Amino acid sequence: MSGYLVMFVADEADDGHADAMRETARGLRGAGFFDDPDLGGQRTTGTYLETDTLEDPVALELIARVSELSDALACRIEVQHREIILGHIVYGQPDEQLAAVLGFGGP
């Protein structure tokens, strides 16, 4: 069963975040971009990829690109797969919850 990897700005987002997310997804096979400036009063902007597993090389590349974006824009990104919150990327680094899901060792 296929699912979606979804990553979006968890902080207040603006046009700069939207432009950066669009560029992050561009050129990556299967990756998409979304931007809803009025969802519940807070702008929601992010990227997605249909993927069965987080081990998919394209999924890993998208996570890496979004991590770089998070660091460059000093923002927090929520990461979901199959509509389950996996954790956050904070200023380019996975939080403890996301690091465990991705199999990264502790600090």
What is each residue range found by the language model?
Residues 1-4, 34-42:
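Short, flexible, solvent-exposed loop/turn segments with mixed acidic/basic and small polar residues
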Residues 24-32, 41-107:
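Charged interaction segments
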Residues 1-26:
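Short, extreme N-terminal segment that most often corresponds to the first beta-strand
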